[in-house]
Amino acid sequence: MTNTVTVLAESTGFSAVNTIWVLLGAALVFFMQAGFAMVETGFTRAKNAGNIIMKNLMDFCIGTPLFWLFGFGLMFGDGKFIGAYKGIADSTYASAAPDGVPFFAFLIFQTVFCATAATIVSGAMAERTKFISYCIYSAIISLLVYPIEAHWICGGGWLADLGFHDFAGSTCVHMAGGVAAFVGAAILGPRIGKYDKNGKAKAIPGHSLTLGALGCFILWFCWFGFNGASTTSMEGDAIPLAGKVFVTTNLAAAVATITTMIFTWIKYKKPDVSMTLNASLAGLVAITAPCDTVSPVSAAIIGIVAGILVVVGVEFIDQVLKIDDPVGACGVHMLNGMWGTIAVGLFSDGTCGEKGLFTGGGAHLLGIQLLGMVSVIAWVAITMTIVFQIIKHTIGLRASEQEEILGLDVTEHGLVSSYADFAPAMSQAMLSYTKDDAKSVVKVDKSTEPVVPVEKAIKVESYATDAPSADGTPKMTKVAIICKQQKLNDLITALEDIDVTGVTVTNVLGCGMQKGQPEYYRGAVVETNLLPKVKVEVVICKVPTRAVIDAAKAALYTGHIGDGKIFVYNIENVVKIRTNEEGYDALQDD
């Protein structure tokens, strides 16, 4: 079998080792999708985990046929600005493949690179983007935006003729994806609760740094294929070059990670885990363009700058520009893609082209790199602004207020939780949410007419008696209110208005199925559905029970089934442990 393959390779002019090298690289770059999915899922909230996984899956699945049908032709067709389209990707474009590599091996290699550029946007627009709108974006970037700018650099376009150098995609993949992410996040607006009324940024922590770290390690591992296999050969001079690429890639990432750890340790008094994970990716992005043409010392310097740039960039975008990027995609990919592009013009040792400014080559290469960087930024920014604005003003770009607060897993996909048998954690940002935090989203609760009266929407079940206590002291009553999570702030405000200040809030799951609105899992109807709710409990003595019930109804009522339930119970006694007071006295404020 081995001899047959060798003879066939020789007779067709293909190189078995080069083909294997390219296919191995394609497999590793494909697996980067899993890395991105884990990073984005871990850095965001659990209620959106399924939605993020779905978006990463669809990035690749939508992009693959579109790149095959149209994108590859635009990227590798003849022409300096736009490739001349000659039909779907087939042997017509065989001349685009590197020496010794079959066309279809080269096609899959380019396909996975296109998918990488598309998936970068997912993290920056996470937790508030309509799924259908994201799918449309994904199709357009794979069909048109990426192939055209990549043609300029990798497909024999005008930047390639000028000597622009982007070995594995700092510019055409990462910077382009980062710019698209920046534009999308800016047009989309911040998540509910991200900024207070004064515009100060508030942290919305991700639910699993463990998943984020797993994604980071997957991406680091796969980056050896992303950069290393971009040699497209393992023969002749490409053999030592591949080793050099592996070393510079690894070194830049490691140094960037150390730099950010030290920088955040000094800045925040403790080393920041999420920023340090971002730094590993920032170093990888920055070294992707110059990895073949810089020395290990230069790679370390590139890593140092990347480690500082990612922290400063993420903070600037988040706190100064007020653009909400949940995973730091803009700081990692856009800013460090720019830095990697510029680094070629500064540190190139001439291995694969001109020398850079700091290595005796003057400013010529740096000028070309800057021209290419600005050109790609302009192309992506303009086209993606048009795309996102059209989507925004037609089918809508952003999920509704109610959908965002409940989570896109349940509202977009009917998925109550991505973690079976685990109750979702209640976000601190959700607890402090106010209507003013979401001026750019649709107010769902106010947009529809009530369909049932308040008595049916909010049922009251009383287990309390009206008889006074045996010793004549004021009667104590517990009121338990089950309601939607997004109504919690309104309810607490209403209770405070009637001088009920002590409340206990518990995260619970409610079981129910609304008529005419079945949910499906793998095609089967889900007969019961556990939905996230909150239980608010108050024990009252001085405040009338009826006043609490009326206040709760006023705060929770929308006129739809599921507004909530109120339970009323007798309380035999209350003991305040600190003062040993009992009964009425134990319920009074100090």
State what each model feature region is.
Residues 3-463:
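Glycine- and aromatic-enriched membrane alpha-helices
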Residues 411-415, 430-590:
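Positively charged, small/polar-rich N-terminal and surface patches that mediate targeting and assembly
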